[in-house]
């Protein structure tokens, strides 16, 4: 009977550990999902910046063309063209930087997705393990109840003798 109690207590301890691990995995999953959400927001922001920079670059390139055609004075034309060329260079550099950040963020999002999937599988595994342990605990409790009832009957029969 003591062994049965020890087994039940051990099963309860295992169940408690499984529940704790499942809760920890769920917390980690929530954290990873939050990180994923933040990375998605960052990705969207960088995408908008990249699109804006591309649009601005196209506008400046068009403006550069128009200024070159309209300018009568070579000195003025040269100065304005240099300024616009410099702006174009800066925008191209900014576009390259944004593209790099976009690629990095995309890779980080992919890695975060992989982590989230891993933790989801781990949570499911721990939940199945917990369910199995709970079922075993119920079975052992039923066995304990039956054995105790039989023991009480035997004890009662012995007392009646």
Curated annotation (Swiss-Prot):
One of its GO terms (biological process) is mitotic actomyosin contractile ring assembly. GO terms for molecular function: actin filament binding; actin lateral binding. Residues 40-52 have a biased composition (Basic and acidic residues). GO terms for cellular component: actin cortical patch; actin filament; actomyosin contractile ring; cell division site; cytoplasm; formin-nucleated actin cable; mating projection actin fusion focus; mating projection tip. Transmembrane segments: none annotated. Signal peptide: none annotated. Keywords: Coiled coil, Cytoplasm, Cytoskeleton, Repeat. Residues 1-161 form a coiled coil. InterPro entries: Tropomyosin. Pfam families: Tropomyosin (PF00261). It is found in: Cytoplasm, Cytoskeleton. Residues 40-65, 107-134 are annotated as: Disordered. Forms part of the F-actin contractile ring during cytokinesis. Homodimer. The molecule is in a coiled coil structure that is formed by 2 polypeptide chains. The sequence exhibits a prominent seven-residues periodicity. This is Tropomyosin. The lineage of its organism: Eukaryota, Fungi, Dikarya, Ascomycota, Taphrinomycotina. The gene is cdc8.
């Amino acid at each position: 009977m003591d062994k049965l109690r020890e087994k039940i207590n051990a099963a309860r301890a295992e169940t408690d550990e499984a529940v704790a691990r499942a809760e920890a995995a769920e917390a980690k999953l929530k954290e990873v999902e939050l990180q994923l959400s933040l990375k998605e927001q960052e990705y969207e922001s960088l995408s908008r910046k990249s699109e804006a920079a591309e649009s601005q670059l196209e506008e400046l390139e068009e403006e550069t063309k128009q200024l070159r055609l309209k300018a009568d004075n070579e000195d003025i034309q040269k100065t304005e063209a240099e300024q616009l060329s410099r702006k174009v260079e800066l925008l191209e550099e900014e576009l390259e930087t944004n593209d790099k950040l976009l690629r990095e963020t995309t890779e980080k999002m992919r890695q975060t997705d992989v982590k989230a999937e891993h933790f989801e599988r781990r949570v499911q595994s721990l939940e199945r393990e917990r369910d199995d342990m709970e079922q075993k605990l119920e079975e052992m409790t039923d066995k304990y109840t039956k054995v105790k009832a039989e023991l009480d009957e035997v004890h009662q029969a012995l007392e009646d003798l």
